[in-house]
């Protein structure tokens, strides 16, 4: 490194020399990357990734010092720089595009250079004095982009699962609360959008909560997959340029730092090419999106009306719905959630394509995978918050209308099958539809069953509860 002016410093690499702004912590590799793609979707937009990468570098520095591979004073300065980055400092020093060629090399070198230059300052040296602390020889010692970048990506995804799971729990609880509130309010169930048999609003809301809880379990299963890392495998899994002891030491220290169940991949070469953890993570996120879309779709449909739709329930009015139709109010929150879910389906396709594109000893497409997954997780986290706060918690049911639907549906004739047979019950249902009367009224004329027994058999709330249990009691 040499000074060219008070505004720049001159650095060199295998391609040649380049001036780097004197006031930045990155170096020549980052400077070249900035001018390469110009997508303006940078690593700094994913703070989880930056924090995770600094954590990986800190664990590696501790391992290198423990094994006597790096001077303790240098290691201390490197660790201190990493801690600052983990705390959110220097966040503006990561300008490389997330989607990059080279399997994350630009991100790795950006991190190496920022750590090296900040460590130099901590050690009382000038930025760019790589004769003392070098981005490759010291910060990146015993490492490659190909083992550290995926490790950082996976830790970032684990970090992002936390708020996503918390939003899922809160939304599930909101549906549980609605279920408890309306466990005795009966309505009609529908299959193929046709009248089916009675159920309670509580059962319907409880089903949404149950689906969300299954997604929480899926996240729990994904974490151990993401926590299986390949540190020390370096370029292609053979561990070239790394001390044989480094792998175990780095994994140990990373587990201690993060408190996560970090383990070493059992087959380093296979782990270098296999991105199965990303597939599993994407699948879990997509499953959540499917269930959210189901809930949003159903609420939107049940909210239809108010005169010519189902009108089973009302979602909160949040905005005027039309520039031409007075008093029209749209279900804007369910529709917003739907669009977020559509985006997640696209995310899943992208991730699966990227995973499938791994060739020979390396998959070069981690950058787009982690970008899509982190973006999708943040999107769903916020979508569930607005769904809960601005929609679900304010839902009001139209209990009288729901009860009328349940009592007047011809499908409750199914309850008569056991007593008079399917064909006779079907005839009663058909006559009820044709004459506009209820099944109870027609059955009173066309069967010998006593009135009290008919009232009991065709009681909508009894039919909804099966053997007299609430949905929660049955589940327990």
Over which residues does each language-model region extend?
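Conserved, well-structured ligand/cofactor-binding cores
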Residues: 2-476
């Amino acid at each position: 490194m040499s000074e060219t002016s008070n505004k720049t410093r001159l650095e060199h690499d295998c391609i040649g020399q380049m001036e780097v702004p004197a006031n930045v912590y990155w170096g020549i590799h980052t400077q070249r990357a900035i001018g390469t793609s110009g997508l303006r979707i940078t690593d700094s937009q994913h703070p989880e990734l930056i924090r995770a990468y600094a954590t990986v570098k800190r664990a590696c520095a501790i391992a290198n010092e423990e094994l006597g591979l790096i001077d303790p004073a240098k290691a201390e300065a490197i660790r201190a720089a990493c801690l600052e980055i983990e705390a959110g400092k220097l966040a503006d020093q990561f300008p490389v595009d997330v989607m990059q060629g080279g399997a994350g090399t630009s991100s790795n070198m950006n991190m190496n250079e920022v750590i090296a230059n900040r460590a130099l300052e901590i050690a009382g040296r000038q930025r760019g004095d790589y004769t003392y602390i070098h981005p490759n020889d010291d910060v990146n010692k015993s490492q490659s982009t190909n083992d550290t970048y995926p490790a950082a990506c996976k830790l970032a995804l684990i970090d992002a699962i936390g708020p996503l799971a918390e939003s899922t729990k809160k939304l599930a609880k909101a549906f549980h609360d609605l279920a408890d509130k309306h466990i005795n309010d009966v309505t009609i169930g529908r299959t193929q959008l046709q009248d089916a048999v009675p159920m309670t609003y509580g059962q319907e809301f409880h089903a949404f909560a149950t689906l969300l809880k299954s997604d929480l379990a899926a996240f729990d299963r994904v974490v151990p997959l993401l926590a299986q890392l390949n540190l020390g495998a370096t370029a292609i899994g053979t561990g070239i340029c790394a001390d044989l002891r480094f792998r175990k030491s780095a994994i140990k220290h990373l587990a201690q730092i993060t408190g996560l169940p970090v383990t070493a991949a059992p087959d380093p070469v296979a782990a270098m090419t296999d991105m199965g953890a990303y597939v599993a993570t994407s699948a879990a996120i997509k499953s959540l999106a499917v269930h959210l879309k189901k809930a949003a779709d159903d609420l939107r449909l049940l909210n239809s009306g108010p005169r010519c739709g189902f009108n089973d329930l009302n979602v909160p009015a949040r905005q005027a719905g039309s520039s031409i139709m007075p008093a029209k109010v749209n279900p804007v929150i369910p529709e917003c959630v739907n669009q977020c879910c559509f985006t997640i389906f696209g995310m899943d396709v992208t991730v699966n394509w990227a995973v499938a594109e791994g060739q020979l000893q390396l998959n070069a497409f981690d950058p787009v995978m982690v970008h899509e997954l982190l973006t999708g997780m943040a999107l769903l986290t916020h979508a569930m918050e607005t769904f809960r706060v601005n929609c679900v918690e304010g839902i009001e049911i139209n209990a009288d209308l729901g009860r009328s639907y349940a009592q007047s549906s011809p499908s409750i004739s199914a309850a008569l099958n056991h007593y008079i047979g399917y064909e006779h019950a079907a005839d009663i249902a058909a006559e009820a539809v044709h004459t506009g009367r209820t099944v109870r009224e027609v059955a009173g004329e066309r069967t010998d069953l006593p009135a009290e027994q008919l009232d009991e058999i065709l009681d909508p709330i009894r039919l909804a509860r099966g053997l007299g249990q609430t949905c929660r009691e049955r589940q327990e």
